[in-house]
Regions:
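Cytosolic regulatory regions of ion transport systems
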Residues: 1-652
């Protein structure tokens, strides 16, 4: 039987404890140096006097020399006053060697240890001892948008990111988005730790059991296999659950079927039943937003404004109070609707800038109760052509089907995969009759440096096609936020930033775990939904041919709500487009004069500017005015036929 070789114990110990081993080697080296020097000193001092003692070649003389060689100073106590010059020189050499090899090495070792400590803190090596922080596990293109949306929350926020991606690249992506959008990191601290999000040890090092909420992102967002992404996310979820079930966990998946399967598993598993988990399919969410945006170009603005903390949010209370009663008592927030959440408990929801505003009540105040309510919902029918086919196509088709079932108009949907020359597809579209809209989908299989390039190529072809009517409404999906303004210079009716929609939706789920079903109904309403958020013009709900005037916001809200028999409650208006600070933007693209070479620019906005570095711009949407404060203030409200209102539609 062969004897198995064992690893070298010294080498193993050295690699496990390098500083300890080096320190001890320095001590041993210095002891040997002193011992050798004392031996040389004994030989040189033979026959000479040291104090009152005559030195010789004996053990007593050696020990006396050893004692004074060990003194790390040139002060020898006078023992070498009568010694020859060679002894003094020897002592000087010994002192210099000690200073260089021992003291110098110790200083260098201490500096190395301090540098290592600084590097560990800078790179977040070791345990991050935080509490009540937000955790992002794994990293994708949604990540920078999610960090930005969390920054809009009130108060101090700490975010810890755990991913095996390069931390410098993650930091650069976050900084670039904040710089491009002109957003400041106010009261926000971001810690990036490199490690496997499914590692129990790595999760414990970020104090995940003390976290407020946890977001599990898809591994590489839209660019990898859906099955691969979802299985990786589920593995991370299982690791998190093994440590904590207290935090609110939000997980995004690619496939709606996977979402349903995990929901079923949560109901059947005792380990998952008590956990606070919200799960959604990003393709389903974005697909429905794309479809609704093509139906009404204002919907992206509605969704972003309702979901982002920039304009406030919806906050709930369990007060046993009707919406009508609450409208007479609140002025700093807007009572909006009652809604039955996941636990079947009906709550009263307010739209407010801050959560504390819903605790400010007033004495009951009488408000206007009459308005010339005249329900005449506009119905529009058109042909919707979707150029391209990706993971959102199925959700788009489902959203169009629900829209047609709600009898709000007829949308004829045609999804056209771009397998052939796009000119042939555009020729078929130009020959079709009736009103037409085009939705361009971004290619989720494109390489990172070519993101959204197919959208620009398709748009240039559309603008250059002389057979197509120039009043055709064109909508586009993009992944890269900075490409939005470049598209708008090409007169695109609506731009939907897929990653941003996912980020704002995820932010609400992280902060309001009880409202998961509410926000799902907000983005994907159907016949079974109790409420819906709709965009209506003044003439669709009111007889306002001569314009209507109300003395305050509260009067207008209460009057429409009561006059519509509590069916419609206005919560805001959609105003003019925010003005982007773009310089030297080429606003007209001459047909046939634009060609895209093999080199595709990632931020295609640079290709449409005369400047190599465009100024900072905002990627946010149109101005949305929410009526969630100053309800009693004398503030004249004028409703015109074309006034665009955001209303809560109570269907029950």
């Amino acid at each position: 039987m062969l004897r198995r070789k064992q690893p070298n114990r010294f080498k193993t110990f050295y690699y496990a404890h390098p500083y300890f081993v080096i320190f001890n080697i320095l001590i041993i080296y210095n002891i040997i140096l002193i011992a050798v020097a004392a031996l040389v000193m004994t030989y040189l001092m033979n026959g000479h006097t040291s104090g009152d003692v005559v030195m010789g070649l004996n053990i007593q003389s050696y020990l006396r020399n050893l004692e004074y060689c060990a003194v790390f100073t040139m002060n020898n106590g006078g023992i070498y006053n009568d010694a020859p010059l060679s002894v003094v020189i020897m002592k000087i050499i010994l002192s210099i060697l000690q200073m260089i090899t021992f003291s110098g090495a110790l200083i260098g070792l201490a500096a190395s240890i301090l540098q290592s400590m600084f590097n560990r803190r800078i790179h977040n090596v070791g345990k991050i001892k935080l509490k009540y922080h937000y955790v992002i596990l794994e990293w994708s293109a949604v990540g920078p948008n999610l960090v930005r949306e969390l920054s809009f929350m009130r108060g101090n926020k700490s975010i810890v990111i755990l991913s095996d991606k390069d931390r410098d690249k993650i930091q650069e992506e976050i900084d670039n988005l904040f710089l491009e959008t002109g957003t400041t990191k106010k009261h926000l601290k971001v810690f990036i730790k490199r490690g496997s999000p499914s590692s129990i040890r790595a999760l414990r090092e970020i104090n995940i059991d003390k976290a407020n909420a946890i977001a599990i992102l898809g591994a590489s967002s839209w660019l990898d296999s859906a099955t691969q992404n979802d299985s990786a996310s589920f593995k991370i979820l299982m690791s998190v659950i093994s440590i904590t079930k207290k935090a609110n966990i939000v997980i995004e998946t690619d496939d709606q079927e996977v979402t349903r399967n995990i929901h079923n598993l949560m109901e059947a598993s005792n380990d998952l039943k008590d956990a606070h988990i919200s799960i959604f399919s990003r393709n389903t969410i974005v697909g429905h937003v794309l479809a609704k945006s093509a139906i009404n170009a204002n919907y992206p603005d509605l969704y972003y404004s309702l979901l982002s903390f920039r304009n406030g949010s919806f906050y709930s209370t369990d007060k046993d109070m009707s919406v009508e009663e609450a409208l007479g008592k609140y002025s700093s927030c807007l009572p909006s609707f009652r809604y039955k959440c996941l636990n079947d408990k009906e709550l009263l929801f307010f739209n407010a800038e801050r959560e504390r505003d819903i605790r400010k009540t007033l004495l009951k105040r009488k408000r206007a109760t009459e308005a010339p309510f005249k329900k005449k919902i506009s119905k529009s029918s058109f042909n919707l052509y979707v150029l391209g086919e990706n993971d959102r196509s199925e959700a788009i088709a489902e959203a169009v089907r629900k829209h047609n079932e709600l009898n709000e108009g007829k949308v004829n949907l045609k999804i056209l995969p771009i397998n052939n020359d796009i000119d042939d597809l555009l020729e078929d579209i130009s020959k079709a009759k009736g009103r037409k809209k085009i939705l361009i989908l971004s290619d989720n299989n494109a390489k990172e440096e070519n993101i959204d390039s197919n959208v620009f190529l398709s748009l240039i072809k559309i603008k250059a096609n002389k057979e197509l009517s120039q009043d055709i409404e064109v909508f586009a999906e993009i992944f890269e936020p900075s490409n939005r303004f470049s598209l708008e210079t090409l007169n695109v009716s609506g731009v939907i930033i897929a990653n941003q929609i996912v980020a704002v939706y995820m932010t609400q789920l992280l902060c309001h775990e009880e409202s998961h079903k509410l926000y799902e109904d907000l983005l994907m309403p159907d016949n079974d939904s109790d409420i819906a958020f709709e965009i209506r013009q003044g003439k669709e709900l009111l007889d306002c041919s001569n314009n209507l005037e109300f003395n305050s916001r509260g009067d207008f809200i209460n009057a429409l709500y009561i006059s519509s028999k509590k069916e419609y409650l206005p919560i805001g208006f959609i105003g003019e487009q925010q003005k982007a600070k773009l310089t030297d933007v080429v606003t007209n693209v001459v047909s046939g004069a634009v060609s895209v070479t093999g080199k595709v620019i990632s931020n295609i906005g640079n290709a449409l500017t005369l400047s190599d570095s465009p100024e900072e711009v905002s990627i946010d949407f149109k101005d949305v005015l929410f009526l969630n404060k100053n309800l009693n203030k004398k503030d004249k409200i004028i409703i015109r036929p074309d006034t665009t209102m955001i209303v809560v539609h109570n269907k029950k």
